[in-house]
Amino acid sequence: MKLPEIFASPANVRTVLQGTPIFSKGDESGEMYVVQSGEVDIVLNGKIVETVGPEGFFGEISLIEDSLRSADAVARSDCKLLPVNRHHFLFMVDEMPQFALHVMKGMADRLRRADKRAEG
């Protein structure tokens, strides 16, 4: 499943320049992002904990939990992002179970990488 193809719409693409914050820890959230091109760093307590590249996504946790942002997201390079709002996200989960599985797999992969980093 290629998320950029599902959510791509020229009117929907958000261009973000290198070094630009996308959101900050503690911000209210209303959308997740799919990376169409470029890279985004996820930063927690001043440390890069994940770099998300093309076809990856970030910001989904706050949509699922309806919570504040848990980390900062900063454009590592110039990038094109596809925002997915809560309404569209929930619609996709209802209508395309494989989308929900894709998101869960991405979250599980991220958790596994975090566990490996914590182990040393």
Model feature map: region roles:
Residues 1-120:
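Cytosolic regulatory regions built on CNB/CRP/Popeye-like sensor folds
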